């Protein structure tokens, strides 16, 4: 009984965490375990102040999140349209370029769990600043010194840096702007989508004008811009910390042992698999259905552009608790409808199914980022859950396209492989309800222990 009361208290006070950018209730009123978990993600410990509503530095943080998110996909997406040019110029094989394009997803799966640990030990602001510096170095390495070796090393370095931002931004939103997590996630997801679309659009024209190293290197400019507000935020955080304080390495819940965390991780993993498979193979499916390469390319652009509607729909939907579960099911059914349409739909209706797939996959991704904050009791737990879910998710995403390719070899048809995506989308729908449960991980764990 006592354990249940402590768990409920932790859940009730999840959104009252304080830091120099957002203050809430007095620390003394919060459970000791939760105070320790919060301290785990903070850099030097901070002096609480009571400040409700939108904090004075909130706009700075929001801009910093958007600027960082803008660089979380563009350095990766740029490679795809330039594969042929890079292969011919460096004299490498198609298999080598396939490895380079798969490297970011593999790096996300490998480095995501480490992001939460580094955030607890050194402070999230410090890790994010360091990751931006590493991102700059990775971009510079492969664009200024073009060779097969630097292409691999630079891509690996920038991918590891991006993994830090992927994991820590949702946790930072929970700590610094707990009442506006939806807004922060919307800015983060929109920044990724806009930069991905821009990167894909300018890569080839810029490469034809100045060579393929230019579209790879141009993102040093946007990364440098993103570094400026994060240096300021780190300074504010340090200035508010008491003298002599130091980060603590205490550990939150072990999310890897919680069934609810695994359900959410698999939910995100299926979303990632479907997304990367649609992006990678839909052009071939559409051409097999009779569309020209240009028409297939236009529908690919539609997929990216209309994804913003999914972000807006999920971020601004006025739902909470059980309503969030219905939203999760609804947006997952949108993915299922898109997958079924790509498989069974006629040529003239493909624009509709591509649109539904784009809206659905982006919506589920945004929802997962929100759930990292909403289903945890502290920023430390949010970072741990985010790291686990993204490690599992991108691990599945890395395997998925390979499986689709093998299935194509067996069936001899790209269209038939969409049946596999439809089946996986159905499984995603089955996980949607439990993944969006209003209970925190600690509450579900307590329920399991008491047989509920």
Task: Set out the residue ranges of the language-model regions.
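Intracellular juxtamembrane helix-capping segments at the cytosolic ends
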Residues: 164-177, 363-377
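Conserved MFS/SLC helix-loop-helix module at the cytosolic interface between two early adjacent transmembrane helices
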Residues: 110-149
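A late C-terminal transmembrane helix in Major Facilitator Superfamily
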Residues: 376-421
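Cytoplasmic helix-loop-helix junction between adjacent transmembrane helices
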Residues: 154-192
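Helix-loop-helix hairpin linking two adjacent transmembrane segments in secondary transporters
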Residues: 150, 178-180, 186-235
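Extracytoplasmic gate region of multi-pass secondary transporters
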Residues: 79-80, 259-311
């Amino acid at each position: 009984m006592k354990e249940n009361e402590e768990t409920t208290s932790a859940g009730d006070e999840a959104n009252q965490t304080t830091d120099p950018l957002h203050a809430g209730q007095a620390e003394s009123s919060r459970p000791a375990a939760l105070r320790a978990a919060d301290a785990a993600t903070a850099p030097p410990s901070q002096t609480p102040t009571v400040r409700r509503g939108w904090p004075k530095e909130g706009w700075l943080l929001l801009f910093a999140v958007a600027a960082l998110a803008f660089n979380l996909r563009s350095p990766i997406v740029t490679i795809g349209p330039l594969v042929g040019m890079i292969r011919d110029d460096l004299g490498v094989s198609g298999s080598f370029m396939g490895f380079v394009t798969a490297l970011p997803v593999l790096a996300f799966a490998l480095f995501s769990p480490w992001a939460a640990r580094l955030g607890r030990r050194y402070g999230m602001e410090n890790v994010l600043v360091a990751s931006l510096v590493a991102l700059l170095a990775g971009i510079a390495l492969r664009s200024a010194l073009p060779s097969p070796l630097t292409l691999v090393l630079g891509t690996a370095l920038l991918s590891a840096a991006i993994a830090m931002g992927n994991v820590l931004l949702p946790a930072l939103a929970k700590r610094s702007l707990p009442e506006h997590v939806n807004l922060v996630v919307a800015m983060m997801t929109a920044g990724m989508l806009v930069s991905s679309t821009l990167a894909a659009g300018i890569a080839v024209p810029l490469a034809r004008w100045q060579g393929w190293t230019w579209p790879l290197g141009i993102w040093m400019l946007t990364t440098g811009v993103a570094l400026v507000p994060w240096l300021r935020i780190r300074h504010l955080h340090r200035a508010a910390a008491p003298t002599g304080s130091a980060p603590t390495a205490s550990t939150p819940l072990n999310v890897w042992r919680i069934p609810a965390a695994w359900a959410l991780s698999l939910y995100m993993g299926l979303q990632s698999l479907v997304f990367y498979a649609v992006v990678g193979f839909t052009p071939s499916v559409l051409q097999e259905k009779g569309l020209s390469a240009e028409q297939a390319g236009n529908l690919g652009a539609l997929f990216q552009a209309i994804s913003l509607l999914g972000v807006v729909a999920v971020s601004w939907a006025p739902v909470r608790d059980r309503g969030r579960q219905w939203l999760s099911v609804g947006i997952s059914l949108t993915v299922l409808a898109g997958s079924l349409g790509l498989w069974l739909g006629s040529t003239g209706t493909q624009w509709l199914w591509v649109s539904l797939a784009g809206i659905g996959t982006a919506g589920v991704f945004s929802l997962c980022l929100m759930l990292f904050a909403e289903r945890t009791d502290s920023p430390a737990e949010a970072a741990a859950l985010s790291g686990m879910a993204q490690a599992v998710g991108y691990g599945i995403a890395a395997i998925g396209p390979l499986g689709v390719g093998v299935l194509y070899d067996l069936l001899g048809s790209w269209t038939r492989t969409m049946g596999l995506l439809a089946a996986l989308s159905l499984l995603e729908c089955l996980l949607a309800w439990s993944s969006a449960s209003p209970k925190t991980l600690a509450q579900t764990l307590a329920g399991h222990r008491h047989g509920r």
